[in-house]
Regions:
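Conserved beta-hairpin
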Residues: 55-91
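Alpha-helical transmembrane spans of integral membrane proteins, capturing the lipid-embedded, hydrophobic core
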Residues: 22-24, 53, 57
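A broad, low-specificity signal marking well-ordered, structured residues that form hydrophobic/aromatic
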Residues: 71, 106, 116
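N-terminal membrane-targeting/pre-transmembrane regions
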Residues: 1-44
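C-terminal halves and exits of single transmembrane alpha-helices
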Residues: 84-107, 112
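Hydrophobic alpha-helical transmembrane segments
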Residues: 43-54
Length: 142
C-alpha cells in the first residue's frame, strides 16, 4: 500500500437531509410555540413542554448520528463511524467487502467473520460512485 494520507468518505444527500430536517424540526417547534395564543400557552404544563422538547431533542440527536457517519481510510486501518459507534479495523483484520446489487451500503467483513456496515457509503449517493470507493478498498486488502 502506498502512503497517500487519510481519506474520509461521508454520506452525500443523507447527511444534508439529516441536518436539514434537524433545523426544520427545531424551527417548527419554536414557530408553533410562538404562534400559539397566550391563553393556550398558559394551559401547557411543564411536563407537556418537557415531553415535546425532549422528543424534538431525541429526533435531532438521532439525525445527528446519521449525519456524522463516516469512513476514514488510512494505510494502517479503516475507521468506521456509524451513528455514535466508532470502530477501528486494522487492514490486517479485513477479509473483504460486500456490496451486492440492491444493498443500501457496503459491508466490511473481518477475518473473524464480523460484519461492519459502512453506512457513510450510501448507495443512494450514486451506486457507481460507491462502487469506485469499494473497489479502491478491495485493492488495499492485504
Amino acid at each position: 500500500m502506498s502512503a497517500t494520507g487519510p481519506t474520509t468518505h461521508r454520506p452525500g444527500g443523507t447527511r444534508y437531509v439529516a441536518y436539514g430536517a434537524s433545523v426544520a424540526l427545531v424551527a417548527m417547534a419554536v414557530a408553533i410555540t410562538l404562534a400559539l395564543p397566550q391563553e393556550i400557552r398558559e394551559q401547557v404544563t411543564i411536563e407537556q413542554a418537557v415531553t415535546l422538547y425532549a422528543s424534538v431533542g431525541a429526533f435531532v440527536l438521532i439525525l445527528h448520528g446519521i449525519g456524522r457517519s463516516r469512513v476514514t481510510v488510512t494505510d494502517e486501518e479503516l475507521e468506521v463511524v456509524n451513528g455514535f459507534r466508532t470502530r477501528r479495523v486494522p487492514w490486517t483484520q479485513v477479509k473483504g467487502f460486500a456490496f451486492g446489487e440492491g444493498d443500501p451500503w457496503p459491508t466490511l467483513v473481518t477475518h473473524d467473520d464480523e460484519r461492519v456496515k459502512l453506512f457513510a457509503l450510501q448507495g443512494t449517493s450514486g451506486r457507481a460512485r460507491v462502487r469506485v470507493i469499494v473497489d479502491d478498498l478491495v485493492r488495499r486488502v492485504p
